């Protein structure tokens, strides 16, 4: 998924990052946002939904 685009049909499944996890993560690059999906933190462009990074929280 990194380097690809988040599927439009799945955008509704992106959730805010759990507050207790947010303090452990580096800030996203300027212009990008982070969301939570299925155990992963997804760093993405909120306009194009281009995925720049994934962080596995279950590992």
Explain the meaning of each model-derived region.
Residues 1-59:
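Low-complexity segments
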